[in-house]
């Protein structure tokens, strides 16, 4: 795969659906590409849920959706709590610290709160990359985030353009793409990914990978649906571990040079095959997610060590 033209959508879908191409063979192809660009290094990321449950959006996968009656709700946390998270991240060899807020988008006051905090964090931990995930932002807010030292902005496409309206109706696919493009225009590294397992087709999955290639996302988190009771997709079955591996491998082959991260839902979907995912992915979230728990940090560190890989610090 290294010495050929980039895959077309048609080729990628054929490979993804092929019953003749063994998943482990596909994973080996992806590993060749991953090793070429990233060696055996694994980037670590950590999330802080800085504002929870206060949201008017109706995303079908989300436990913080406006549709959810029972959910954890709190306003934007104090600056000291965000700074404490940065200290924990540094102590645990985390390379990127992600500050996440619920809601359609931040107020100017909330952006100022985040910016002041990031400026302080950067003085103490200049090597720690800061990723903000605040929703749909305005141009002037993006400029403030950049000036404060935010390195990366996460805004996931989540699904294909074709399937988008099955997932959420309170904002458009174009809203999401425009947010990613605005961050790029303001020299903030774009992080954008997907959630697989929401009832989308194989064609949708391949379309997601190509859409992320088209917007040139630097970092691509691949989430697998962890069904939450009461949400639109709460009754769906988990994906099989083997399908998850095929998805991760295809995202690597379609986006060979990008940081591919196994993210939310990896523990319950990949199960015992989690270590194999790092043959294609080169990045993971460590610790808990927004409202679902992750596995203990020690298990992730042991997994990396047992594979003969090393933390990219």
UniProtKB/Swiss-Prot annotation:
Domain of life: Bacteria
Function: Catalyzes the conversion of dethiobiotin (DTB) to biotin by the insertion of a sulfur atom into dethiobiotin via a radical-based mechanism.
Catalyzed reactions: (4R,5S)-dethiobiotin + (sulfur carrier)-SH + 2 reduced [2Fe-2S]-[ferredoxin] + 2 S-adenosyl-L-methionine = (sulfur carrier)-H + biotin + 2 5'-deoxyadenosine + 2 L-methionine + 2 oxidized [2Fe-2S]-[ferredoxin]
CDD domains reported in the protein's UniProt record: Radical_SAM (cd01335)
Domain Radical SAM core positions: 37-263
Higher taxonomy: Bacteria, Bacillati, Bacillota, Bacilli, Bacillales
Protein's pathway: Cofactor biosynthesis; biotin biosynthesis; biotin from 7,8-diaminononanoate: step 2/2
Cofactor binding, note field: Binds 1 [4Fe-4S] cluster. The cluster is coordinated with 3 cysteines and an exchangeable S-adenosyl-L-methionine.
Amino acids binding [4Fe-4S] cluster: 55, 59, 62
Keywords: 2Fe-2S, 4Fe-4S, Biotin biosynthesis, Iron, Iron-sulfur, Metal-binding, S-adenosyl-L-methionine, Transferase
Coiled-coil stretches noted in the UniProt entry, renumbered to this chain: none
The protein's required cofactors: [4Fe-4S] cluster; [2Fe-2S] cluster
Positions with a binding annotation for [2Fe-2S] cluster: 98, 131, 191, 261
Biological process according to GO: biotin biosynthetic process
Quaternary structure (record): Homodimer.
Molecular-function annotations in GO: 2 iron, 2 sulfur cluster binding; 4 iron, 4 sulfur cluster binding; biotin synthase activity; iron ion binding
SMART domains (alphabetical): BATS, Elp3
Stated name of the protein: Biotin synthase
Pfam family of the protein (one): BATS
Family: Belongs to the radical SAM superfamily. Biotin synthase family.
This enzyme's EC code(s): 2.8.1.6
């Amino acid at each position: 795969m290294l010495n050929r033209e980039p895959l077309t959508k048609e080729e990628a879908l054929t490979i993804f659906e092929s019953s003749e191409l063994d998943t482990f063979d596909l994973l080996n192809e992806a590993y060749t590409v991953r090793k070429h660009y990233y060696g055996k290094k694994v980037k670590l990321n950590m999330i802080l849920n800085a504002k929870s449950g206060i949201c008017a959006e109706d995303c079908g996968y989300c436990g913080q959706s406006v549709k959810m009656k029972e959910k954890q709700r709190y306003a934007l946390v104090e600056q000291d709590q965000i700074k404490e998270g940065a200290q924990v991240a540094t102590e645990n060899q985390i390379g990127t610290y992600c500050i996440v807020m619920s809601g359609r988008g931040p107020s100017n006051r909330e952006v100022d709160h985040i910016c002041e905090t990031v400026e302080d964090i950067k003085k103490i931990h200049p090597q720690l990359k800061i990723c903000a995930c605040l929703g749909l932002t305005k141009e002037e807010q993006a400029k403030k985030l950049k000036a404060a030292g935010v390195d990366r902005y996460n805004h996931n496409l989540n699904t294909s353009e074709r399937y988008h309206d099955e997932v959420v109706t309170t904002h458009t696919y174009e809203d999401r793409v425009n947010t990613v493009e605005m961050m790029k225009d303001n020299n903030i590294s774009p992080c954008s990914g997907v959630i697989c397992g929401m009832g989308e087709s194989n064609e949708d999955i391949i379309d997601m990978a190509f859409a992320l290639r088209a917007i040139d996302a630097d970092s691509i988190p691949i989430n697998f649906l962890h069904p939450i009771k009461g949400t639109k997709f709460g009754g769906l079955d988990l994906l099989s571990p083997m399908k998850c591996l095929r998805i991760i491998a295809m995202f690597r082959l379609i986006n060979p040079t990008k940081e591919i991260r196994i993210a939310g839902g990896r523990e319950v979907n990949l199960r015992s095959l989690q270590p194999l995912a790092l043959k294609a992915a080169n990045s993971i979230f460590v610790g808990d997610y927004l409202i679902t728990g992750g596995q203990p940090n020690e298990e992730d560190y042991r997994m990396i060590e047992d594979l003969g890989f090393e933390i990219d610090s």
